[in-house]
Amino acid sequence: MKLRPLHDRVVIRRSEEEKKTAGGIVLPGSAAEKANHGEILAVGPGKALESGEVRALSVKVGDKVVFGPYSGSNTVKVDGEDLLVMSENEILAVIEG
C-alpha cells in the first residue's frame, strides 16, 4: 500500500528510538522516548490559498526533519510499519548535512 497525502500534509517515517542513555544504560521499550525526527516519505501537492492558488511545500521527499513531541498524532500502519501523517506547519526544522 502507498499513501498519497492531501493538501499540505506529509508522511514521515520516525527515526529509530534511542534504546541507550548517554551513560550506556539500555532502556526497555516502554521507557525509551520516541524520536522526534524522521524522514519524509511523501508530500502533498501544497496548501490551498484563499486566492485559489496552491503554495508548494518547503520540504521534499527524502528530507530529514525535526518535529515537536506532540506532532503527528495521526499514525497509520502501512505494510507493518507505523508512519506519521502531519501538516507541514508541524515540522520545526530540516536537518542538513
Curated annotation (Swiss-Prot):
Main location: cytoplasm
Gene Ontology molecular-function annotations: ATP binding; metal ion binding; protein folding chaperone; protein-folding chaperone binding; unfolded protein binding
PANTHER family, per the entry: 10 KDA HEAT SHOCK PROTEIN, CO-CHAPERONIN GROES
Repressor listed as a keyword: no
Free-text function comment from the UniProt entry: Together with the chaperonin GroEL, plays an essential role in assisting protein folding. The GroEL-GroES system forms a nano-cage that allows encapsulation of the non-native substrate proteins and provides a physical environment optimized to promote and accelerate protein folding. GroES binds to the apical surface of the GroEL ring, thereby capping the opening of the GroEL channel.
GO annotation, biological process: chaperone cofactor-dependent protein refolding
Keyword set, alphabetical order: Chaperone, Cytoplasm
SUPFAM superfamilies linked: GroES-like (SSF50129)
The protein, known as: Co-chaperonin GroES
Location relative to the cell: Cytoplasm
One Pfam family per UniProt: Cpn10
Family per record: Belongs to the GroES chaperonin family.
Organism (species): Pseudomonas fluorescens (strain Pf0-1)
PROSITE patterns with a match to the protein in the record: CHAPERONINS_CPN10
Quaternary assembly: Heptamer of 7 subunits arranged in a ring. Interacts with the chaperonin GroEL.
Lineage: superkingdom: Bacteria
Record NCBIfam families: PRK00364.1-2, PRK00364.2-2, PRK00364.2-4
Any single Gene Ontology cellular-component annotation: cytoplasm
